């Protein structure tokens, strides 16, 4: 008997909206139907925990997808709990779900159709690709029924007691003419892998398998039999007939069979103690497309008011485009109750952890989670906080093996430093993970904690210097005094170090002191302090004269506390850019010129009063401050200091000319005579060229 029902008004409106709206991402229908099938299997499984008999003759729960090209149908079938007649009427037509209206409002407001299942009305996504849907369902407490509708305002329900269905639901989609791609096994495999790979039940796809089979050539046999009938019967038992072999041929045989598509089971639902290293490696490769095993793994679950499970992996190598600004990040896959939601959830993980790969499966996130409301979702913020915490624990575990951490840091050290720059809450912890070369560490890198343990008695600051390379910094004039006093200096050789040190002021109550900036002081004895004051007084006139010569090129000229063997250096203000930072910013294509002008403050020139050059210069100034040679020497010292301090020469040509003059003086050459000689040569050769040219012209004539 068939009964006809009218759709509830809102359901009718929803179906009309789905059918008449052009929507490109129609593939989500399969995800929704498989998700519903999984829920149905969950329900019967829960019942079987208290009453195993409910599983009856089909204890193995699974989901089947059957494409039928001949009839242009696609069927999604499960042996879950099934639906009674009342369920079919209520769930698929007359009683609007609470999410129906909310989904339509979201859709009309520009929301994504892929959110349909997240409002509890995912079944209706079938009408994105089908113009007619048939649902056959059987519940243990009722006979089987068939629900059918073409989305024309009504649906029918027919009793089918003769059906062979034992239990479950079979949804058959009669596909639209332009949706035949969903009958192709390749396309179906792609969608199942993308959206439903970690559903807890086997998803079996009906596929065609072609095999070659060797069979007797019937045509040859028939011909042979006819020939034998014509021959005399006495020859039927000739020798050799017994050994004659039948001719065979190979034919292709097409069979249909079910093939499990989701072989990678959701490892995160298992106890970490029961998962092997090989299983983690296989799972990592499946979700990341990496060919190498992960360097580190963190499998954890959070329970209580919030419940989610996760597995995080650290790859062995950093991707070549890790810091590309427009790169689409799809490292953390978000699942809600094992249903895939999205793979580029940027709010699930901070930028600096962009190299970590893994999955998060939440039991509490609402299924109506969308990109628009992710940022405001409190549950997601808690998940993010826990992910960061567990990643830090994972890095701690890697750091237990020195060689492993060295390789990890080579690949992801920049990410750790980016975290220090961005993540205020975890900055203190992240500082424990950074490594630097130092004046005492040789070819090995040192931690800040180890540096602090090696600090001299009375040392109050952590001394560091920034630059292009370790080799350059080892011979930098800025570290001379520190080395003379036996103080260790950290070498920061990456551009990101400049940004890190703008955010970090101390470590374990020890202030950071940049040796390339003014205001650096070393612990001095009373005798050293007295000597310093005497040197300042002795160089006062020299400092004043040099400032007058250099003018606006420097802020001031003072006696240095950092130099030991070099004559002079240039330092920047405490809050301005260092020479290395200035170089970095000069290379920025889109730099802010006004900001650069402000931060590239005037430099301070520091003199080493004990250096022979400075002593002789001071003597000359004291004797005659108007000495012409002094001006040239001061500019030459300034330009040389620019180079040794890591700055860019403001006037390379002028510097070269001054160097050339110094060379000529050293060689006792007379510059004027050389120029005259050159001019004389030109004067002598010019007429000869003209004469030669004239004679050749005459020859042509």
Swiss-Prot record:
The lineage of its organism: Eukaryota, Discoba, Euglenozoa, Kinetoplastea, Metakinetoplastina. Pfam families: HATPase_c_3 (PF13589), HSP90 (PF00183). Residues 210-250 are annotated as: Disordered. GO terms for molecular function: ATP binding; ATP hydrolysis activity; ATP-dependent protein folding chaperone; unfolded protein binding. A motif (TPR repeat-binding) lies at residues 697-701. It comes from Leishmania infantum. InterPro entries: HATPase_C_sf, Heat_shock_protein_90_CS, HSP90_C, Hsp90_fam, Hsp90_N, Ribosomal_Su5_D2-typ_SF. Keywords: ATP-binding, Chaperone, Cytoplasm, Nucleotide-binding, Stress response. One of its GO terms (cellular component) is cytoplasm. Residues 228-242 have a biased composition (Acidic residues). The keyword Ligase does not apply. The keyword Zinc-finger does not apply. PROSITE patterns: HSP90 (PS00298). Molecular chaperone that promotes the maturation, structural maintenance and proper regulation of specific target proteins involved for instance in cell cycle control and signal transduction. Undergoes a functional cycle that is linked to its ATPase activity. This cycle probably induces conformational changes in the client proteins, thereby causing their activation. Interacts dynamically with various co-chaperones that modulate its substrate recognition, ATPase cycle and chaperone function. The TPR repeat-binding motif mediates interaction with TPR repeat-containing proteins. Homodimer. This is Heat shock protein 83-1.
